[in-house]
């Protein structure tokens, strides 16, 4: 029994030794004891170990995995979250703000040369001033329009609410009306900005008394501070005009902002360049009234004041300023109203609507491009068909001409032993051309007769006669091509034969 165990162990040891000799390369991975004959096999095996998937712990069925498939909708949503569709801020906005602040800081606060309008002595009701703002191309952070102030009068106890905007350093003209008593104060300055303030008061024929004291104002600075400014009440070199009647019921005027003085901030956001171009085109199509023009209606009392010079391309507000009575609605311009409505709609569009319109325009452009390409391809196909038909006609014509040439060659070869050729050989008409085997064709000047002269080389073999016949056939074809427009072929007469035939007879 012990002997058998010893033999078995010896055999196993021998097998292991032989195996280790045959496959000396052992895999060092944990749990794997495979051996390989060469190092390449071992490297491939180790690579399999490295590429083995490592699964984590078993997941429960209750766990819901969020779908992260990158669909177009999710892509657009991510773009919106990141802010790719937001309009970029203008790089010059901060510079404009800084420049306006610097101009405000450098502006002198002594406004003594300024003049103030004349206010009536006794007023039954407070005067009301309605102003609408017209944007300037420059961004203005705050408003410098002063609050309503109580103006001390000489013989009155009721206040007057007035809104005054310092647009320049002078008030050149003051227009006063006695009938229907409307005070129109219009600033017409040569600077590129102008301002108009229309003040309405009830009917009164009281005398006009200037304000004895200074006119107080509050100037709002961009940093939030409020600074009181005193303006003297004396008016220097002002022209006072008293027309017959200028009825004004609801005056509305535009108060454009002045460069260097921040005006009322625009309620609308900064618009994109495309919107600005669109609005510029609309403004050019409907040009507004020029600055300083006051149109007075004969029966309706329509007054329009426009300050267009203040902004060459102000694109965020309607361009016209109209003051009219309710009794004259026919003077309103529907074209201007529709233009302003379109601008408001363009300003209030949401990004989804913009994107939808953009996609619609892209689809329309793509369809137009496809239609143009289709028309172009159809024209090319038609041209190719025409060229192929023309090519077929030319090929058929070439085939007919080749058949005709072959028939004529056969006819000439059949008449190679003609007695006319024999007579020509005997006469020795072309003795000089025997060496070069050439041919000469002589056409008489007579319109009714043609003479075809053949030249041949008198050789003993038949090969030379065959080549001679082919040369003669070529010459005849050339002759026929030259005289295809002439009448039917006339009698063929050889020049030497006409002289040698009587002698032979």
Swiss-Prot record:
Biased composition (Basic and acidic residues): 346-363
Entry-linked PROSITE patterns: BZIP, BZIP_BASIC, ZINC_FINGER_C2H2_1, ZINC_FINGER_C2H2_2
Post-translational modification remark: Phosphorylation of Thr-69 by MAPK14 and MAPK11, and at Thr-71 by MAPK1/ERK2, MAPK3/ERK1, MAPK11, MAPK12 and MAPK14 in response to external stimulus like insulin causes increased transcriptional activity. Phosphorylated by PLK3 following hyperosmotic stress. Also phosphorylated and activated by JNK and CaMK4. ATM-mediated phosphorylation at Ser-490 and Ser-498 stimulates its function in DNA damage response. Phosphorylation at Ser-62, Thr-73 and Ser-121 activates its transcriptional activity. Phosphorylation at Thr-69 or Thr-71 enhances acetylation of histones H2B and H4.
Chain positions with N6-acetyllysine modification: 357, 374
GO biological process: abducens nucleus development; adipose tissue development; apoptotic process involved in development; BMP signaling pathway; brainstem development; cellular response to anisomycin; cellular response to leucine starvation; cellular response to oxidative stress
SUPFAM superfamilies: beta-beta-alpha zinc fingers (SSF57667), Leucine zipper domain (SSF57959)
Tissue: Ubiquitously expressed, with more abundant expression in the brain.
Family: Belongs to the bZIP family. ATF subfamily.
Protein name from the UniProt record: Cyclic AMP-dependent transcription factor ATF-2
Source organism: Homo sapiens (Human)
Gene this chain is encoded by: ATF2
């Amino acid at each position: 029994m012990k002997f058998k165990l010893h033999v078995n162990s010896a055999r196993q040891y021998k097998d292991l030794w032989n195996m280790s000799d045959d496959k000396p390369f052992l895999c060092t991975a944990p749990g794997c004891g495979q051996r390989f004959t060469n190092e390449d096999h071992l490297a491939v095996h180790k690579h399999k170990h490295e590429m083995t998937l490592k699964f984590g712990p078993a997941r429960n069925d209750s766990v819901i995995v969020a779908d992260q498939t990158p669909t177009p909708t999710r892509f657009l949503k991510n773009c919106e979250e990141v802010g790719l569709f937001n309009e970029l801020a203008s790089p010059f906005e901060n510079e404009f703000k800084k420049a306006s602040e610097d101009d405000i800081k450098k502006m002198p606060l002594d406004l003594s040369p300024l003049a103030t309008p004349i206010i009536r002595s006794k007023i039954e009701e407070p005067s009301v001033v309605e102003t609408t703002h017209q944007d300037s191309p420059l961004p203005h952070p705050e408003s410098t329009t002063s609050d309503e102030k109580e103006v001390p009068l000489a013989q009155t106890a009721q206040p007057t609410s007035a809104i005054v905007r310092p647009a320049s350093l002078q008030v050149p003209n003051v227009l006063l009306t006695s009938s229907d008593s409307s005070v129109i104060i219009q600033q017409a300055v040569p600077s590129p900005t102008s301002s108009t303030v229309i003040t309405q008061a009830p009917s009164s024929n009281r005398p006009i008394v200037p304000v004895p004291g200074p006119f107080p104002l509050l100037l709002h600075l961009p940093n939030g501070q409020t600074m009181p400014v005193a303006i003297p009440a004396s008016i220097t070199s002002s022209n006072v005009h008293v027309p017959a009647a200028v009825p004004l019921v609801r005056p509305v005027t535009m108060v454009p902002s002045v460069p260097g003085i921040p005006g009322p901030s625009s309620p609308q956001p900064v618009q994109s360049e495309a919107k600005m171009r669109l609005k510029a085109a609309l403004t050019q199509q409907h040009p507004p009234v020029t600055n300083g023009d006051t149109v007075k209606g004969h029966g309706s009392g329509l007054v329009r004041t426009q300050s267009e010079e203040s902004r060459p391309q102000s694109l965020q507000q309607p361009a016209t300023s109209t003051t009219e009575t309710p009794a004259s609605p026919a003077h309103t311009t529907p074209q201007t109203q529709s233009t302003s409505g379109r601008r408001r709609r363009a300003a209030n569009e949401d990004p989804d609507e913009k994107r939808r319109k953009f996609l619609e325009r892209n689809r329309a452009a793509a369809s137009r491009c496809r239609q143009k390409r289709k028309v172009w391809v159809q024209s090319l196909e038609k041209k190719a068909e025409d060229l192929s038909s023309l090519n077929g006609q030319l090929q058929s014509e070439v085939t007919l001409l080749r058949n005709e040439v072959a028939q004529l060659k056969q006819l000439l070869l059949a008449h190679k032993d003609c007695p006319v050729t024999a007579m020509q050989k005997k006469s020795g008409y072309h003795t000089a051309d025997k060496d070069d085997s050439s041919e000469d064709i002589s056409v008489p000047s007579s319109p009714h007769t043609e003479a075809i002269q053949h030249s041949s080389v008198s050789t003993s073999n038949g090969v030379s006669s065959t080549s001679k016949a082919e040369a003669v056939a070529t010459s005849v074809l050339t002759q026929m091509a030259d005289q295809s427009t002439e009448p039917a072929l006339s009698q063929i007469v050889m020049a030497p034969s006409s002289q040698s035939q009587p002698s032979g007879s």
